[in-house]
């Protein structure tokens, strides 16, 4: 079955002459004559398997293109926020499913889900499609509704201004299937203008994807009378907790197991695991069990011996990774929280960069880009094999990440820890600036500024 799937979904390549599209005769929706639909199953680098469909009618000239995901719905939905400031931002490739919604707050533009088919386009192409759709019947509107036509003309000018970068604007792409993507122009560094986050789908989104019955309603979970009562936190740490949930793979009922665990010379972490008895799907995740520390922590590890690669590492979602020797930067949300080793962390980083770099290794890529990416990945392999001395830096503004010391409780000569005060921007990203951490039990009701005061 796996071999058949590989044969169907081929990688895009000009040298693969066997990857010809399937041609199917179909009725044109405009003139009702016989047209031609071309279907091709392919795999998009750093994305997933997709089904490309293109229709063309030789009689009336009608054309239509569509993309459908060939993958299952992902475990979580995806929200991507891109700040468009430079010309290269307009050229970023964008992939979305038909269930995705797009919003541009500066234009008060919202494209709801299922109003457009899934497609592979660019950031600029999103606005071009809106501009083209609004411009279609403008001549008729000027005759029938001059005032409405003038308002649309003014709106089209705003869209043109955004496409020409007359002003900075924001694109928000929300896809409950998780099958969406916006290209990072530089795979080696953190994308400074793009934020990717994953979220749990709400009931409406689950109904949209047919993951919930149309008549299903949100249920209020009542505490079970048989639930164990813990006398202390230490008692709770000895118990493996079970939570009912749906399997993200087959969507059948299963459960998540969770247990707090103490890491020596560090703090408590929460280990969560899921194993579905129906389809065999498994997943593991580690979360910090403590509060956000007063200071951030920057840990530097010199990779010189095999023991350094075998060090245990707890990386939280907010922890960024960098290797100065090869000019590598990986943002905090690029890799999910995990408990692994230095070698495992580097291997996971390489696998993600290797998949993402496929955008720069295709037929349209320049020779210089191909050689630069190939050389970069080779250097990362040399670091993992200890052929190239390097220093890995883990920077966690919450201070909740951990790297094992080989000489604890004594100082480790190849492990350096530096504590620092977070910036205002880092506190704002963590939501600390809006928290009331002192006398929070004495909160007074706040009146809205625009609310009229009673005399």
Swiss-Prot record:
<comment type="similarity">
    <text>Belongs to the ZPR1 family.</text>
</comment>
<dbReference type="GO" id="GO:0005783">
    <property type="term" value="C:endoplasmic reticulum"/>
</dbReference>
<dbReference type="GO" id="GO:0044183">
    <property type="term" value="F:protein folding chaperone"/>
</dbReference>
<dbReference type="InterPro" id="IPR056180">
    <property type="entry name" value="ZPR1_jr_dom"/>
</dbReference>
<keyword id="KW-0539">Nucleus</keyword>
<protein>
    <recommendedName>
        <fullName>Zinc finger protein ZPR1 homolog</fullName>
    </recommendedName>
</protein>
<feature type="zinc finger region" description="C4-type 1">
    <location>
        <begin position="28"/>
        <end position="60"/>
    </location>
</feature>
<dbReference type="InterPro" id="IPR004457">
    <property type="entry name" value="Znf_ZPR1"/>
</dbReference>
<keyword id="KW-0862">Zinc</keyword>
<dbReference type="Pfam" id="PF22794">
    <property type="entry name" value="jr-ZPR1"/>
</dbReference>
<dbReference type="InterPro" id="IPR042451">
    <property type="entry name" value="ZPR1_A/B_dom"/>
</dbReference>
<dbReference type="GO" id="GO:0005634">
    <property type="term" value="C:nucleus"/>
</dbReference>
<keyword id="KW-0677">Repeat</keyword>
<dbReference type="GO" id="GO:0055120">
    <property type="term" value="C:striated muscle dense body"/>
</dbReference>
<dbReference type="InterPro" id="IPR040141">
    <property type="entry name" value="ZPR1"/>
</dbReference>
<dbReference type="GO" id="GO:0006457">
    <property type="term" value="P:protein folding"/>
</dbReference>
<dbReference type="GO" id="GO:0005737">
    <property type="term" value="C:cytoplasm"/>
</dbReference>
<dbReference type="GO" id="GO:0008270">
    <property type="term" value="F:zinc ion binding"/>
</dbReference>
<feature type="zinc finger region" description="C4-type 2">
    <location>
        <begin position="247"/>
        <end position="279"/>
    </location>
</feature>
<dbReference type="InterPro" id="IPR042452">
    <property type="entry name" value="ZPR1_Znf1/2"/>
</dbReference>
<keyword id="KW-0863">Zinc-finger</keyword>
<keyword id="KW-0479">Metal-binding</keyword>
<dbReference type="Pfam" id="PF03367">
    <property type="entry name" value="Zn_ribbon_ZPR1"/>
</dbReference>
<dbReference type="GO" id="GO:0030017">
    <property type="term" value="C:sarcomere"/>
</dbReference>
């Amino acid at each position: 079955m796996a071999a058949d799937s590989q044969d169907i979904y081929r990688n895009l390549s000009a040298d693969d002459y066997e990857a010809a599209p399937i041609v199917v005769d179909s009725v044109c929706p405009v003139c009702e004559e016989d047209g031609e639909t071309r279907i091709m199953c392919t795999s998009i680098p750093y994305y997933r398997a997709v089904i490309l469909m293109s229709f063309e009618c030789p009689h009336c000239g009608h054309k239509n293109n569509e993309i459908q995901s060939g993958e299952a719905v992902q475990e979580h939905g995806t929200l991507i926020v891109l700040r468009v400031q430079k010309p290269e931002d307009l050229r970023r490739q964008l992939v979305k499913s038909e269930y995705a919604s797009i919003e541009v707050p500066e234009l008060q533009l919202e494209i709801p889900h299922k109003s457009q088919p899934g497609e592979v386009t660019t950031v600029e192409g999103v606005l071009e499609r809106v501009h083209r759709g609004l411009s279609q019947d403008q001549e008729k509107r000027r005759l029938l509704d001059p005032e409405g036509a003038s308002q649309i003309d003014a709106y089209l000018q705003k869209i043109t201004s955004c496409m020409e970068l007359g002003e900075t604007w924001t694109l928000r792409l929300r896809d409950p299937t998780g099958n969406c993507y916006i290209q990072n122009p530089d795979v080696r560094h953190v994308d400074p203008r793009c934020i990717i986050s994953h979220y749990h789908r709400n009931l409406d989104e689950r109904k949209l994807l047919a993951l919930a019955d149309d008549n299903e309603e949100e249920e209020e979970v009542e505490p079970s009378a048989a639930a164990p009562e813990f006398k202390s936190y230490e008692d709770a740490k000895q118990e493996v907790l079970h939570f009912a949930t749906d399997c993200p793979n087959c969507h059948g009922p299963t459960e998540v197991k969770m247990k707090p665990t103490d890491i020596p010379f560090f703090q408590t972490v929460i280990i969560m695991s899921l194993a579905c008895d129906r389809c065999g799907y498994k997943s593991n995740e580690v979360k910090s069990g403590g509060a956000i520390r007063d200071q951030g922590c920057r840990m530097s590890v010199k990779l010189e011996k095999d023991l350094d690669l075998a060090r245990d590492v707890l990386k939280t979602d907010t922890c960024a990774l960098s290797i100065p020797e090869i000019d590598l930067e990986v943002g905090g949300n690029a890799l999910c929280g995990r408990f692994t080793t230095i070698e495992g962390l580097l291997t996971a980083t390489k696998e993600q960069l290797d998949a993402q770099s496929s955008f720069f290794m295709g037929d349209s890529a320049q020779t210089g880009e191909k050689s630069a990416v190939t050389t970069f990945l080779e250097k990362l392999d040399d670091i993992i094999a200890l052929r190239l001395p390097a220093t890995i830096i883990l920077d966690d503004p919450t201070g909740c990440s951990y790297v094992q010391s080989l000489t604890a409780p004594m100082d480790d000569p190849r492990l350096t820890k530096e504590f620092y005060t977070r910036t205002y921007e880092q506190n704002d990203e963590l939501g600390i600036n809006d928290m009331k951490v002192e006398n929070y039990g004495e909160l007074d009701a706040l009146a809205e500024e625009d609310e009229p005061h009673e005399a």
